[in-house]
């Protein structure tokens, strides 16, 4: 798409991308709604910055030695969060008060041996990480690119002030971004840049967005480098877009929307500024609009989203970036969702996000600051709640009826951030989780390794799916492109599919037909199979189940009535101790196991 548009205008006159008014434009900065909030946050950040979190070698090696990512990343991200807050406060106040701690943090980041994370320290996709970084050959990963964009924004906003206060620091800053980000991006090929038919993921647009920010702000007067950056970015984005269906569904789940579709939005905005008139028509492409609106279709109510793969049910709060994306593609529903979320958000600047990796992108903060007034003034006249939708590219059906919202996943087990969850169903009633997808634990060395499916949350037996028992064996789903649902048929208010292929070769199993339908009365789940032995169906819930014969009560929220070849029911409490899971769930979840043969129908309402 983009490379074709660029081929028609190869000699375009480069434009300039301006992320926000310069700090000297006091009329623009002094009237921002966030003015006082950022001055207060800057004071706290200045106190915290008296002790910059250290990044010693033993923390870097923690990933290699123990598989733990969190300890190094906590300190790494804390440095960048402090820098962002101090820069925003200095831009608001424009007094020089925050320049000394800003300089200390810039210097500390420039002194780091590597900007990539230990978990990303490799040059070949899906290969084991190297124990130590090679300082002569930087790796451009997600957060190296984030760091480059952050320092480029510091240069744009405060470069002159920093150089006046600390002569030579500005040269060091720009030199490190050039050496660690721009030259490698221009001269080497990292897997996320795209290579023909090779599958891409959110890394592609996320890294590309940040490399474009760094190029645009460090080399605004270099037509040669701007043109080369535009061409490189256009190719990468095309490689990313090829993996999306026309329906715009994100196979990585709603939580990755902000890292995939929203970074696509920003990358396209920058490209449109750098290459005036070349890419403007992309905003009218149905695929791009569908990608924008995906998050609105996945929204349940309040903070909850339909989730699968590595996605949490708490997939983030919508805000200014979503609003601007919706505005660009003409989506009133997306603008309305973003405006409502932003208005209700007690932390619109993202200062207290539980995810360490959030709050480190200075451009996002500028977007929020300068977009806040428009978002708060928006009135959602004509905005309607999204209806049912079928995403054939991923095999996802979203249905709404009365008090209920259901997500029914067909597809297969080769998604990016895959879990073995083909055929699973999630269900909400009155905006509360009823049948749940647990999500993913804190990332570790095992998460993205050949041992991934040893992690319990990845396994089909911890999703709302069957397992098959026979001859002393228990059969669960397998991971890989060949393990899919077949004969998938979208129905009014539901979906029908055969799940047998997702399990591979199970003796005696050739068909497991699941039909799920949602009405105002609730969800009807009908499973029929030719498997001759016992089937054990998992039902995961947040509400404690109470079994009364063929009735299961899920707290006071709902009840399930079972009929068919029922053999028995068992319930168990599942202790939740992982920090990432505890962000979404209480300390105990529940698994109900329904044992049956032949046919089972469950009416949940």
Where are the regions a protein language model picked out?
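Cytochrome P450 core scaffold surrounding the K-helix E-X-X-R motif
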Residues: 435-447
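Solvent-exposed loop and edge beta-strand segments that line ligand/cofactor-binding
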Residues: 67-79, 91, 128-145, 187-205, ...
């Amino acid at each position: 798409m983009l490379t074709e548009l660029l081929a028609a205008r190869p000699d375009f006159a480069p434009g300039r991308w301006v992320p926000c008014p310069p700090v000297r434009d006091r009329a623009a900065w002094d009237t921002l709604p966030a003015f006082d909030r950022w001055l207060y946050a800057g004071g706290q950040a200045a106190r915290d910055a008296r002790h910059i979190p250290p990044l010693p070698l033993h923390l870097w090696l923690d990933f290699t030695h123990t598989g733990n990512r969190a300890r190094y990343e906590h300190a790494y991200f804390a440095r960048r969060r402090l820098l962002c807050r101090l820069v925003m406060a200095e831009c608001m106040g424009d007094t020089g008060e925050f320049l000394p701690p800003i300089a200390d943090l810039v210097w500390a980041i420039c002194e780091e041996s590597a900007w990539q994370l230990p978990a990303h320290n490799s040059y070949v996709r899906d290969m084991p990480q190297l124990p130590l970084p090679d300082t002569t050959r930087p790796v451009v990963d997600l957060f190296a690119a984030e760091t480059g964009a952050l320092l480029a924004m510091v240069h744009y906003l405060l470069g002159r002030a920093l150089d006046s206060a600390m002569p030579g620091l500005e040269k060091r800053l720009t030199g490190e971004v050039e050496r660690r980000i721009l030259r490698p991006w221009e001269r080497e090929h990292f897997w996320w840049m795209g290579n023909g038919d090779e599958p891409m993921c959110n890394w592609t647009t996320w890294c590309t967005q940040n490399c474009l920010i760094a190029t645009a702000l460090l080399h605004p007067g270099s037509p040669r480098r701007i043109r080369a950056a535009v061409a490189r970015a256009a190719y990468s984005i095309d490689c990313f877009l090829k993996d999306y269906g026309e329906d715009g569904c994100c196979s990585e789940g709603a939580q990755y929307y902000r890292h995939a579709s929203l970074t696509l939005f920003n990358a396209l905005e920058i490209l449109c500024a750098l290459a005036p008139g070349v890419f403007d028509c992309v905003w009218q492409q149905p695929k791009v609009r569908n990608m924008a609106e995906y998050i609105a279709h996945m929204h349940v109510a309040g903070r909850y989203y339909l989730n699968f793969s590595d996605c949490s049910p708490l997939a983030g709060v919508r805000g200014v970036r979503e609003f601007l994306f919706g505005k660009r593609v003409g989506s009133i529903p997306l603008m309305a969702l973003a405006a409502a979320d932003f208005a209700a958000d007690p932390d619109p600047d993202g200062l207290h996000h539980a995810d360490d990796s959030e709050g480190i992108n200075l451009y996002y903060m500028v977007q929020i600051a300068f977009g806040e007034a428009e978002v708060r003034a928006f009135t959602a006249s004509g905005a309607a709640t999204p209806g049912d939708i079928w995403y054939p590219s991923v095999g996802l059906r979203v249905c709404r009826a009365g008090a209920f919202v259901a997500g029914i996943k067909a597809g297969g087990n080769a998604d990016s951030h895959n879990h073995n969850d083909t055929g699973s169903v999630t269900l909400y009633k009155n905006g509360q989780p009823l049948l749940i997808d647990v999500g993913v634990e804190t990332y570790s060395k095992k998460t993205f390794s050949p041992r991934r499916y040893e992690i319990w949350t990845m396994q089909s037996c911890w999703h709302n799916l069957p397992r098959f028992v026979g001859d002393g064996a228990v059969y669960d789903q397998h991971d890989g492109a060949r393990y899919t649902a077949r004969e998938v048929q979208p129905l009014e208010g539901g979906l029908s599919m055969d799940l047998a292929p997702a399990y591979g070769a199970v003796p005696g199993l050739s068909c497991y037909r699941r039909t799920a339908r949602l009405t105002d009365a609730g969800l009807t789940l009908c499973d029929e199979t030719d498997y001759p032995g016992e089937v054990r169906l998992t039902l995961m819930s947040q509400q404690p189940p109470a079994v009364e014969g063929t009735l299961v009560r899920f707290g006071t929220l709902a009840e399930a009535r079972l009929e068919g070849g029922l053999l028995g029911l068992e319930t168990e409490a599942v202790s939740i101790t992982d920090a990432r899971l505890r962000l979404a769930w209480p300390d105990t979840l529940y698994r109900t196991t329904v044992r049956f043969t032949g046919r089972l129908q469950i009416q949940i309402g």
